[in-house]
């Protein structure tokens, strides 16, 4: 069983991948810093959810 993410997290993550192609990697810590830099996410919890989802998408693309 996996984690279910809200449509907000999915939408923001996909938009960030499209607007910044090639910047995100399959490393969570790197993506966490990039999400903080590129977005105006207000909470650490939400930032980590978005970074984790981006990491998962990038890992599946490889």
UniProtKB/Swiss-Prot annotation:
Which Gene3D superfamilies does the UniProt record give?
Ribosomal protein S17e-like
Does the record bear Kinase in its keywords? no
Query: Which InterPro entries does the UniProt entry name for this protein?
Result: Ribosomal_eS17 (IPR001210), Ribosomal_eS17_CS (IPR018273), Ribosomal_eS17_sf (IPR036401)
**GO cellular component annotations of the record:** cytosol; ribonucleoprotein complex; ribosome
Q: Which GO terms describe its molecular function?
A: structural constituent of ribosome
**SUPFAM superfamilies, per this entry?**
Rps17e-like
An example GO biological process term is: translation
Keywords associated with the record: Ribonucleoprotein, Ribosomal protein
Q: Which NCBIfam families did the record assign? A: PRK01151.1
Family affiliation: Belongs to the eukaryotic ribosomal protein eS17 family.
- Protein name as annotated: Small ribosomal subunit protein eS17
What is the originating organism of this protein? Answer: Methanothermobacter thermautotrophicus (strain ATCC 29096 / DSM 1053 / JCM 10044 / NBRC 100330 / Delta H)
Q: Which gene encodes it?
A: rps17e
């Amino acid at each position: 069983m996996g984690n279910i993410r809200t449509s907000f997290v999915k939408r923001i993550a996909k938009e960030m991948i499209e607007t910044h192609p090639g910047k995100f990697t399959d490393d969570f810590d790197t993506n966490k810093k990039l999400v903080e830099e590129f977005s105006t996410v207000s909470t650490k919890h939400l930032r980590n959810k978005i970074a984790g989802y981006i990491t998962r998408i990038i890992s599946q693309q490889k």
